[in-house]
């Protein structure tokens, strides 16, 4: 018996919402981490140690930004694909009913 793949646009949009929540969580945590790093940056650190710490934190902040962008890309793709599926389904229904 052949299996059939069923697409559920509503479930796709629900999952897109979850990706948005994950993206917001990553963004919030990255912001907290950056603020914490800024607070300890001047606490007894100077010269090369402070510059290295700031460079590391800047790289980590960019990495988190990349993760957020990827999560948003998945979210956008799910919504786009759900919309496309619904449009194609409606077009198919119109063709079949005529």
Swiss-Prot record:
Disruption phenotype: EsxJI deletion mutant shows extremely slow growth in broth cultures. Belongs to the WXG100 family. CFP-10 subfamily. Induction: Differentially expressed under different growth conditions. It comes from Mycobacterium tuberculosis (strain ATCC 25618 / H37Rv). It is found in: Secreted. The gene is esxJ. One of its GO terms (cellular component) is plasma membrane. InterPro entries: ESAT-6-like_sf (IPR036689), T7SS_ESAT-6-like (IPR010310). Keywords: Secreted. This is ESAT-6-like protein EsxJ.
């Amino acid at each position: 018996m052949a299996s059939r793949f069923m697409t559920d646009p509503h479930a796709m949009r629900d999952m897109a919402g979850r990706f948005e929540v994950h993206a917001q969580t990553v963004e919030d945590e990255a912001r907290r981490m950056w603020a914490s790093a800024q607070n300890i940056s001047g606490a007894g650190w100077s010269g090369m140690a402070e510059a290295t710490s700031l460079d590391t934190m800047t790289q980590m902040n960019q990495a988190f930004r990349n993760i957020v962008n990827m999560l948003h890309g998945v979210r956008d793709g799910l919504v786009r694909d759900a919309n496309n599926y619904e449009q194609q389904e409606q077009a198919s229904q119109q063709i079949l009913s005529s």
